Regions:
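Bacterial N-terminal signal peptides that target proteins for export
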Residues: 4-20
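N-terminal signal peptide c-region/cleavage motif recognized by signal peptidases
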Residues: 25-26, 30
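Lumenal/extracellular ectodomains and adaptor appendage modules
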Residues: 31-447
Length: 447
């Protein structure tokens, strides 16, 4: 159930703030060229050079004697009008078995390996390294204004300096600049050392994997060590996760399946833009990828205590604007729209219908709306107070113009928009929601 732009998964209202980090791929890579029109409205970064977001990499370690690993790199190009995307081949690595597909349709895309000099000739890549080779991908369509082009790049690297054996121990030692990653060990290996905080999971085929979201600046200093003493074959296959909820009091917890889901690969993110606190209002947008064949709608349940207005929806892959309908849960059932989940009959729901997905297709949606929530967002004396539980792995809150942060109960990184507004980013790598209690005061010049 999607409730009030929060990913609800039976977490209750646990007050646990996980590790947090800057949404660097959108904020640091994209160099904004224009500030918002004014006020405290939505802001979308723009760039004249190549920019990307939502990066996630899966490293599948092959037999250690090969010094090779298979990379699946999910990335979203965001530069409006871009027809190509360039992916560097890391120095010291020998690339082979490359392929690229369009994430929306699942269809292959044309690509070629070019030199850094060739890449630099493209206005998208003025800073391309002449000594580096690049995979140049021809996009299925130019990136729409404020839209996206989602890609999946697959390749095999051979790199003895990154992946080697130390006696009987397998070592994967590789700084990773992408913020969300998974490393899958070869069959029969168990992890005995991981240098960054990570989820330990078992893949459906029995292989052990480590998955993490990087919570610091710069590359993650990842070192994974593993030894070959784990089960293989049917003995290694994971038991199906249970549906019984956690017994932990005082709240009913999430199911085992929800708690063990890979956080780093979850691609639901949200940005709140606080209006002046006297209004109790905040605009927001949240992005969501639908992957289930036959689904022909998205339902967002308005959280109790909030009033939603001005809803809109866009297919980021194409820039197409979708019609938005507001209805009750009972009316949703009567409409026949398949949103893939049940909704309480009395619930107030924002529904976005779309063409049913075919097998192998995916759809990336951006939903924008304005909420009024006096309990969550208010003015207490001279202090702005934003008190709201946020359930996505990647959350951000932008203060209204003229305000500065005085308290943030949950750790956050701070950055500044071109118009001076302060943005706080909360990356939550734990399965519980992060309870954001944020306070701010007016800047001197804003009086």
């Amino acid at each position: 159930m999607r409730q009030g732009a929060r990913a609800m998964s039976g977490r209750g209202w646990k007050s646990v703030a996980g590790t947090v980090a800057l949404l660097a791929s959108a904020a640091a890579v994209a160099a904004p060229v224009a500030a918002p029109a004014g006020g405290d409205g939505l802001y979308f970064p723009t760039s004249l050079t190549q920019a990307e977001t939502d990066e996630y990499t899966r490293y599948e370690l092959l037999a250690p004697e090969t010094a090779s690993f298979r990379i699946t790199y999910e990335v979203t190009a965001t530069t409006a009008g871009a027809k190509y995307f360039y992916n560097p081949i890391r120095k010291g690595s020998i690339a082979s078995d490359e392929s690229v597909r369009d994430a929306r349709l699942g269809t292959p895309l044309h690509f070629e390996v070019v030199s850094g000099t060739q890449a630099r000739a493209d206005p998208l890549m003025p800073d391309a390294d002449p000594a580096t080779q690049y995979i140049r991908v021809t996009l299925a369509r130019p990136v729409p204004e404020h839209g996206q082009a989602r890609l999946v790049i697959v390749k095999t690297y051979k790199d003895p300096k990154s992946y080697y054996q130390d006696g009987t121990t397998l070592v994967f030692d590789r700084p990773l600049g992408v913020r969300r990653n998974k490393v899958v060990l070869p069959a029969g290996y168990e992890a005995v050392g991981v240098s960054v905080p990570a989820q330990i999971r078992t893949e459906p085929d029995g292989r052990i994997s480590v998955s993490f979201m990087h919570a610091g600046a710069g590359a993650a200093p990842l070192v994974v060590r593993a030894v070959k003493d784990a089960q293989v074959g049917s003995a290694a296959l994971p038991q199906a996760p249970g549906t019984q909820r956690s017994w932990e009091s005082p709240f009913e917890g999430a199911t085992e399946q929800e708690r063990l889901a890979e956080r780093a690969h979850q691609d639901r993110d949200i940005v709140y833009f606080l209006q002046q606190p006297e209004t109790h209002a905040f605009s927001l947008y949240h992005d969501y990828t639908e992957t289930r064949a036959g689904i022909d709608g998205y339902a967002n349940v308005v959280r109790a205590g909030s009033v939603a207005s001005q809803p809109s929806a866009t297919i980021l892959d194409t820039g197409e604007q979708l019609k938005v309908r507001e209805m009750s849960g009972a009316e949703l059932v009567a409409s026949g729209i398949n949103v893939g989940e049940s909704v309480e009959p009395a619930a107030h729901v924002v529904v976005i219908p779309f063409t049913p997905l075919k097998a192998g297709e995916t759809l990336r949606l951006r939903i924008a709306e304005t909420y009024t929530a006096p309990v969550s967002y208010r003015l207490e004396g001279k202090e702005l107070v934003f008190d709201r539980s946020l359930g996505r792995p990647r959350n951000a809150v932008v203060l209204p113009g003229g305000w500065y942060c005085t308290f943030s109960a949950a750790p956050a990184t701070l950055s500044q928009l071109p118009d001076g507004r302060v943005r706080l980013d909360y990356w939550d790598d734990r399965p519980e929601a992060v309870d954001v209690l944020l306070k701010a005061r007016r800047r001197i010049e804003a009086h």
